[in-house]
Amino acid sequence: LTQELPAWLQANRDVRPTNNAAVGLSMAGSASLILSVYHPNQFTYASSMSGFLNPSEGWWPMLVNISMGDAGGFKANDMWGPTEDPNSAWKRNDPMVNINQLVANNTRIWIYCGTGTPSELDAGADGGNLMAAQFLEGLTLRTNVTFRDNYIAAGGTNGVFNFPDNGTHNWAYWGRELQAMKPDLQAQIGR
């Protein structure tokens, strides 16, 4: 994402290797922010939609492990090693832990998370899937609100935070939010 792909895209698709955006949904939300922490010239815009923004905190490693297992039998420790190590990749890949660098980089950020309360966008959803989508979004909201508060306390002023009164862990909400974010993203990266 940060070396081979940008060079290939520039050579073959005329896509510049700097001043790009990273947008992540769900577990990829924290990754989009971390990409901008460590590669600020490449990713001047980062967005997390319903992301887990403090994955090294408390019980989040266990929840990430459960999610990864459900998504294909993967194990979180195989990704970032044991959480007990204070220098672990869990900390290096945690937006909350790295919030001061994100602020120092002046990355434009857009953070979205619903409350877990369904709306018309959930009409026709399967009951079991809806219950899981409600649970995940409600669970995730706390880290997003805490991230906003810590970002502002660290002096961050280049962010949009959208926490509407409803929204589940569902593509319909993310699609709507992407459309709302699009003008801001285009203005930032000049496309």
Residue spans of the language-model regions?
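Non-catalytic cap/lid and distal C-terminal segments of serine-dependent acyl enzymes
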Residues: 2-191
